[in-house]
Amino acid sequence: MEETDDGEDFARESTAERIIRLTGEISEETSEQFILNLNRVAKIQGEIIVIVSSDGGDIEEGLRIIDALQLAKNKGCPIYTVVSGKAYSMCAYIACIGDKRTIYPHSRLMFHASRFEGADDGRTLTAVELQKMHDELAVYDGVFRELLANVGLDHATIERMLASDTYVNAEEAISLGLMNSIETEII
């Protein structure tokens, strides 16, 4: 999240402009700050612009952001997502939640299935632990498939995109229906 010397002025300015930025790694801290800003802006009905630029991050925190955006939409606040630079991994799924979705000409999205990163401490995992992780990843992948289906992708395309890291440039994002338009103005 962007910070200024006077965080209160920034929050007031963001609320007035109805713009929220999601930048950097998606973490507990990032999602808390994003949801706090979203709640401030969503107090008054109207379109909310969400500018994203991130390598992704924590799946659960990203899903919290998606849930919060969906709740804002349900309260009468259409969401307009703008990809600026990159929306990789979890951030790509967040970018796809918008009612209107745009991307700058040289920006990219990257999709993949959920991954487990851990157990670097040298310990051996039991079959039960591995099964639990597998089950959790399957749930996340189901959510990712649902999010991609909601923008109109067919099953075969979704499976191809989740099979490995799939990078999509602005033109491809439009042709796939992931984004509605290429942004031509500075927001």
Regions found by a protein language model. Give the residues of each.
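Terminal-region recognition feature
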Residues: M1-I187
